[in-house]
């Protein structure tokens, strides 16, 4: 099924409801501390403004629990202020996302003007994908556009439910870019195709690994999950984090990779500490085996070198999950080393959301990558080969 995109629709004079992802971090004063998600939605919003649509934006923010203070803490007002600055035009903020007051604001909205509805999750019906709530949201719209890839894996009222009750629907440019890059990296990659997979647990990445074994030429494994694989091969891992109940599964994954002639690379040296703390002494262990009393907290320099060489020789590189406890400086070299190697590569470089995206952002290398996914859970499910409700709703 082909994705229908916003530029294929006639928008002039229509009420265009765009589901965006403005779930942005705020400081204690309620100011936006990172506007990346707001900026990511600008191409779609600007397109609708220039097409003289009546632009209605909707998003969630945080996880409201129905407490009165949530209304102050989790209001979308800071996002409205920042968006107004970025667009250099007024953004009207509604005090709710449904109800008579909102209907009046929509009725009075002029072509090319922007209305931001208040936090969708102030209504529990949003996450329950309640039909009556979805119909009420749909009554505000002639056109429904999904540009919130970060929530595309959730079948909520605004991300999937209301699409059934709106005649015209499409994906925004951000969702289009996500599907294009993630789809291309996994569907028809330029080869050699190298995947870098990290993170703490094998159990979190089983489906990802299975899908990548079917598609990649090589998989470089880092993060704490590497110790479960090493232990499955009989390599001593000291007191590193290991999922004991996943050792058999790790063996099966290694066998499957071998059967498919996929190089599954594991660390050959490690950066270790006695405990996962910034203050712990940093010990480089120049061997696959980790001595008793130490735990692996990052890939070692030889491993990073091997992974760099694979990245340099690749035509497509996909990265999901850090190589170590990168939030703490002593254990961050592996993760930032991978980020720098990808940034220096002429290959199609795709970073699959979550911690890897945070690391790339921290390293200031976002613009050096072909694509950094804005979806953590959504990009993970996409890589696993699952259907995303928020994307399916945009298909023709």
From Swiss-Prot:
PANTHER family: PHOSPHOGLYCERATE KINASE (PTHR11406), PHOSPHOGLYCERATE KINASE 1, CHLOROPLASTIC-RELATED (PTHR11406:SF23). One of its GO terms (cellular component) is cytosol. GO terms for molecular function: ADP binding; ATP binding; phosphoglycerate kinase activity. Substrate binds at residues 21-23, 37, 60-63, 121, 154. SUPFAM superfamilies: Phosphoglycerate kinase. The gene is pgk. Monomer. It comes from Anaeromyxobacter dehalogenans (strain 2CP-1 / ATCC BAA-258). One of its GO terms (biological process) is gluconeogenesis. ATP binds at residues 205, 296, 327, 353-356. It catalyses: (2R)-3-phosphoglycerate + ATP = (2R)-3-phospho-glyceroyl phosphate + ADP. This is Phosphoglycerate kinase. CDD domains: Phosphoglycerate_kinase (cd00318). Keywords: ATP-binding, Cytoplasm, Glycolysis, Kinase, Nucleotide-binding, Transferase. The keyword ATP-binding applies. The keyword Lipid metabolism does not apply. InterPro entries: Phosphoglycerate_kinase (IPR001576), Phosphoglycerate_kinase_CS (IPR015911), Phosphoglycerate_kinase_N (IPR015824), Phosphoglycerate_kinase_sf (IPR036043). Belongs to the phosphoglycerate kinase family. Pfam families: PGK. Pathway: Carbohydrate degradation; glycolysis; pyruvate from D-glyceraldehyde 3-phosphate: step 2/5. Signal peptide: none annotated. It is found in: Cytoplasm. Its EC number is 2.7.2.3.
């Amino acid at each position: 099924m082909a994705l229908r995109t916003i530029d294929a629709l006639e928008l002039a004079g229509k009420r265009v409801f765009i589901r965006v992802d403005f779930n942005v971090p705020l400081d204690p004063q309620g100011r936006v501390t990172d506007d990346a998600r707001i900026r990511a939605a600008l191409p779609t919003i600007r397109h609708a403004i220039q097409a003289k649509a009546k632009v209605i934006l909707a998003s969630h923010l945080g996880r409201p629990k129905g407490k009165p203070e949530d209304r102050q803490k989790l209001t979308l007002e800071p996002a409205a202020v920042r968006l107004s600055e970025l667009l250099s035009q007024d953004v009207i903020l509604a005090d709710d996302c449904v109800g008579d007051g909102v209907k009046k604001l929509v009725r009075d909205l002029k072509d090319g003007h922007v209305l931001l509805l208040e936090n969708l999750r102030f209504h529990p019906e949003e996450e329950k994908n309640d039909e009556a709530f979805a119909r009420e949201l749909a009554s505000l719209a002639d056109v429904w556009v999904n540009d919130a890839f970060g929530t595309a894996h959730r079948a909520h009222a605004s991300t999937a439910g209301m699409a059934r009750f709106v005649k015209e629907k499409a994906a925004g440019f951000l969702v289009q870019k996500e599907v294009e890059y993630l789809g291309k990296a996994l569907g028809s990659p330029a080869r050699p195709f190298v995947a870098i997979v990290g993170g703490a647990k094998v159990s979190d990445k089983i489906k990802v690994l299975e899908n990548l074994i079917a598609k990649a030429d090589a998989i470089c494994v880092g993060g704490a999950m590497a110790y479960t694989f090493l232990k499955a091969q009989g390599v001593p891992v000291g007191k590193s984090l290991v999922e004991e109940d996943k050792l058999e599964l790790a063996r099966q994954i290694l066998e499957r990779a071998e059967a498919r002639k996929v190089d599954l690379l594991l660390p050959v040296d490690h950066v270790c500490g006695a405990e996962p703390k910034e203050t712990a002494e940093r010990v480089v262990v120049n061997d696959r085996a980790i001595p008793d009393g130490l735990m692996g907290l990052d890939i070692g320099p030889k491993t990073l070198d091997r992974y760099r060489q694979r990245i340099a020789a690749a035509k497509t590189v996909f990265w999901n999950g850090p190589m170590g406890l990168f939030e703490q400086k002593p254990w961050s070299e592996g993760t930032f080393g991978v980020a720098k190697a990808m940034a220096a590569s002429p290959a199609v470089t795709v970073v699959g959301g979550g911690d890897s995206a945070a690391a790339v952002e921290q390293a200031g290398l976002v613009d050096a990558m072909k694509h950094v996914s804005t979806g953590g859970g959504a990009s993970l499910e996409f890589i696993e080969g699952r259907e995303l409700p928020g994307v399916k709703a945009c298909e023709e």
